[in-house]
Amino acid sequence: ETATKTVKAFRSEISKKHGTDSIFSVFIAVDEVPEKFEAISSGHFFYTPSKKGLGETHRSEMKSILENWSVNSKEEVLSWLDGFCKLSTYEISIPVLKDRDLAPQGKTGLIVSTLFEYDIVKKAYESGWYGELKEELEKRIIEVLSNSIYPILKDRILFSFSSSPLSIESYSG
């Protein structure tokens, strides 16, 4: 019985916590044959568009944005997001390259994920522009990939949707 109480107390305490790094994922449906993507990359890999990477500058800028959220404009946050997307590392998965039955004939689906700070998404939600942040992040990720590894991407997108750290939290609790 003591062990049960300890476990319940631990569960209660841990349920109030959250991590800092989480995942932002975008699914992109593309009107393009898988072979075009296969000529560029494998079905699963990590990609960083810039050798510079995020590094300490990014972390200090992000910390400043979070600490000054109430005085920063939305435009300042979105400007920071531009730099983030250009320097981030992406995990890219193209399931149809492993199994052609995983997409309609002549179509390709990409799953693109990157680490993303939970607190930024949470603050955007609390400020009333969570949906816009998701759309802007999705748009910037697609733009970065279109301007680098996948120039075929931009004009061939059928649809896309994303999940943020808050999406993950809502499903996992």
Feature locations, PLM:
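Mid-domain catalytic core of redox enzymes
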Residues: 1-103
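Glycine- and acidic
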Residues: 23, 120-130
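Hydrophobic, well-ordered secondary-structure elements that form the walls
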Residues: 28, 112, 145
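Short coil-to-beta-strand
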Residues: 105-114
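Activation-segment/catalytic-loop signature of the eukaryotic protein kinase fold
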Residues: 134-137
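Short, well-ordered amphipathic alpha-helical segments that serve as non-catalytic structural scaffolds
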Residues: 140-144
